[in-house]
C-alpha cells in the first residue's frame, strides 16, 4: 500500500516531491492562522470601545483581515486541488502494482475487482485526507500552544490554579477524555464496517454473474437471502453510528462554550478585554481541534481500518508480500 507509491522509482518524485509541496502550503496556512489570531485582539478591542476610536480604524482592521484572508483562500483551494491529484496518483500506483500479481495467480480471490477498484481508491483518499489533517494539526499545535500558554495567565481555573498554561492542560485533558470515550462508544464499528463490505461483495458478485446468466443467477430466493444479510448488517451499523454521532456532536458543542465559560467572569470583572477573550477562544479552538483530530475523524478512521484489513488480506492472497514482482504480463500505467 505504501511501498508501491513511496518506494518505487516511477512514483518517488510524485510521492516525496508532492509531500514537500503539501507541507509548504500547510506551513503558509498555519502562518496566516497565527496572524489572524493576532488580528482578533486588536479588532475586537476596537469594537468594544467604538466611541474611543475612529471609523477609519475599523476599515483599516477590515482591510488587514482581507490581506490575510484572500491569500489563505487561494492557498487553501490550490492545496485541496493538488492533494486530490496526489491521492489519485497514489491510487494509480497501487492499482498497477497489484495487477500483475493478480493476473499470475490461478486461484480465485474473493472480491478482487472491488479490492483493486474501490478499496485502492478509498485507501488513497482517506490516508491523504487524514494524513493532511495530522500534519496540519501538528503545525497548529506548535504554533498555537505557546500562544494559548501565554494567554492562560489571564484566567484562573479551579483545579488548575497553580499550574502554568492551564488552558492548554484543559484542552489536553478534555481531548484525551473524549478520545477514550469515543473509543469505547465506537469499539464495534470497525468489525461492522468489515462485515458490511463482505455482504455487499457477495450481493454485487451475484448481480455481476446475473448479467451474463440470468437463469442460474439472480433468482428471487438468492437475492432475498443476500439482501437480508445486507439489511441486517446495515441496521446494526446505523444503530452504532447513531449513538456514536450523538456522543461526538454533544462533545463538540460543549467544547465550543468551554473557553467562554472559563473566561467570561474575567471579562465582566474587567480583568480582560473582549479582544483578549476572542483571541484566547480562537487559540483554544485551534489547540483543542488539533488534540481532537482523531475524535472528529473516528468514522473515517474506522473505514480506513476496515479497508486496510481487506487490502492486507488481498495482498496475501495474490502473493504481493511473498514473491518478487512478476515480469510476465506486467502492466504499464
Regions found by a protein language model. Name each.
Residues 1-33, 42-66, 79-83, 100, ...:
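Membrane-integrated ABC transporters
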Residues 33, 37-41, 95-99, 141-144, ...:
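Alpha-helical transmembrane segments of polytopic integral membrane proteins
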Residues 122, 195-205, 209-254, 258, ...:
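An intracellular "coupling" helix at the cytosolic face of ABC transporter transmembrane type-1 domains
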Residues 85-96, 100, 170-215, 272, ...:
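Cytoplasmic coupling helices
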Residues 149-176, 240-308:
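Helix-loop-helix
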Residues 25-52, 72, 139-160, 254-274:
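Juxtamembrane "helix exit" motif at the C-terminal ends of alpha-helical transmembrane segments
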Residues 20-32, 36, 70-87, 173-188, ...:
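Hydrophobic alpha-helical membrane-associated segments
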Residues 10, 117-169, 255:
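Hydrophobic alpha-helical transmembrane segments of ABC transporter permease domains
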